[in-house]
Amino acid sequence: MKKIFFSALCAFTFFSASAQSNFDIGRQTSVDAFSRRNTELYREGRTNTEKYEKAIGSAYTNEKFTLATISGVPEAVSVRYNAEADSFEVQNNETNAPADKKFFALPKQTEYSNIDFKNGTYKFRLLNYKDVNDKEVNGYLIEKFSKNDVVLYKKEKINYIKGRVAENSYAMDSPAKLVRAKDEFYLQLKSKQIVEFPKNKKKLIALFEDKKEAINTYLKTNDPSFSDENDMAKIAEFVSTL
């Protein structure tokens, strides 16, 4: 069953009769998540990407597909991350695949939660967390550092800005744009809670009030920046020792 991962994935996307008969929703297999229900959801998501066609910019930080391993998938596959939709696209390697079936969206399910690029550039994790706006999110974060259950995560994000039609003949239409947003950083504590990475000493101490003296000593000795990614990794490493 595992050897036909792509065939099963394609079959569900095309809603073929054979897929419906061979892959019932209740069956516990490595491709069970690619059920009719999920295919409908992700087909709708793919259709929505049509909004990008006339937009300036890209929904991807890297438009190229990259070989990666995905938990729950027995073989490496080529993927790319849609930073606007916060979703992963799996390349369809079938010969003569139609233009609108060149890739499929990966279901956001626990069994596919770890995505590691083979070239070592990215380790994506599907997690539940509260974003910088205190909104509950089930989405992908990039693992930048991990030790003793303390993890530094990075969020790459692209915003879609709708275009505007000119109000009169003297003005010009404004096209839709895809704009890279400022990266967000999160810290997973030993309790497994994921919080926004502290922006200063005061906020770091607020997370570990009983370790105030140790934190003050570390910051005074090392003088790390709370906005530099490399220094954030050093702070996370220090936190892992608390």
Regions found by a protein language model. Give the residues of each.
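Long, compositionally biased interface segments
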Residues: 195-242
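Exposed alpha-helical structural elements
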Residues: 29, 102-105, 110, 203, ...
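N-proximal short alpha-helices
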Residues: 50, 177, 188, 204-208
